[in-house]
């Protein structure tokens, strides 16, 4: 293995199902998420608002862990090709944190759809793009659990709902954003090459995880199945949220309209 391959391997760490830590972290994440959702269901009034603010403060601190760890640890090389929070999960980590204060409907819609997709797949098929140091590993599971759980809390405890056709709006936003990030990857890798490539949102090369939605195809063709999978996931998540937290304006409409629009 040459030096470049060693650097790349140190960044892209895949945790496989045959590793004990895979199951420890997965089960702990599911249990923690369930407990937090149930705890918020029992809160009312000022205590509920205070809990949401505290959760926002906590998540801001969680999002600051990777850059602070890189700045304070002399063994870590902060790299613009990997350390910027412009993966979907990194963006949604900040959005769910800030939306604890903003309570913005569009931010909720975007982060609930894409945070759920990214968070669930990250927990089931983890790939740590900046290595698996204990601090980074812990941050990975905190962040990806939070981007699934916090939107559920916002919907169940604070009354947020998906707007009609919100899943289509989210797909368009995700397509535009990921394409822009793909151009950013190209710029970094072409004009500022480094030992490790910029692969934000996996728009430069496919993820390395064993996932049925990730096909062994050349760029850019592997992106097409990912877009198809994105649409499928958006429809399924919209169905689940509409079932658990129905939209009042659609009461009395047909079953298909209530679940899929």
Model feature map: region roles:
Residues 48-100:
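A glycine-rich, hydrophobic loop/mini-helix early in the fold
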Residues 12-30, 167-171, 175, 188, ...:
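Membrane-interface transmembrane-helix boundary segments in multi-pass integral membrane proteins
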Residues 32-38, 96, 147-167, 178-179:
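Alpha-helical transmembrane segments in multipass membrane proteins, preferentially the mid-helix core
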Residues 71-80, 101-106, 126-139:
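Membrane-interface helix caps and helix-loop-helix hairpins in membrane proteins
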Residues 40-53, 101-107, 157-168:
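Membrane-interface helix-boundary motifs at transmembrane edges
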Residues 59-68, 115-126, 174-183:
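Aromatic-anchored segments of alpha-helical transmembrane domains
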Residues 84-85, 138-149:
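Membrane-interface loop-to-helix entry segments
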Residues 22-28, 77-89, 109-112:
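Structural signature of hydrophobic alpha-helical transmembrane segments
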């Amino acid at each position: 293995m040459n030096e470049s391959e060693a650097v790349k391997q140190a960044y892209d760490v895949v945790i496989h199902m045959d590793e004990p830590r895979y199951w420890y972290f997965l089960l702990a994440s599911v249990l923690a998420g369930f407990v937090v959702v149930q705890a918020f269901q029992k809160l009312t009034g000022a205590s509920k608002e205070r809990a949401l603010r505290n959760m926002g403060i906590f998540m801001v601190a969680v999002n600051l862990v990777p850059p602070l760890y890189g700045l304070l640890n002399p063994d870590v090389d902060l790299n613009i090709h990997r350390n910027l929070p412009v993966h979907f999960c990194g963006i949604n980590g900040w959005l769910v944190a800030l939306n604890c204060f903003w309570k913005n409907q569009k931010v909720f819609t975007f982060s609930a759809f894409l945070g759920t997709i990214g968070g669930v797949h990250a927990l089931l098929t983890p790939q740590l793009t900046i290595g698996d140091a204990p601090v980074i590993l812990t941050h990975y599971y905190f962040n990806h659990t939070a981007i699934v759980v916090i939107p559920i809390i916002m919907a169940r405890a604070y009354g947020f709902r998906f707007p009609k056709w919100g899943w289509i709006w989210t797909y368009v936003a995700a397509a535009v954003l990921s394409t822009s990030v793909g151009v950013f990857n190209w710029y970094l890798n072409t004009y500022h090459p480094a030992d490790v490539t910029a692969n934000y949102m996996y728009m430069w090369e496919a993820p390395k995880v064993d996932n049925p939605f990730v096909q062994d195809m050349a760029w850019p063709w592997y992106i097409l199945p990912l877009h198809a999978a994105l649409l499928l996931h958006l429809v399924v998540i919209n169905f689940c949220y509409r079932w658990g937290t129905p939209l009042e304006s659609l009461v009395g409409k047909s079953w298909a309209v209530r679940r899929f629009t």
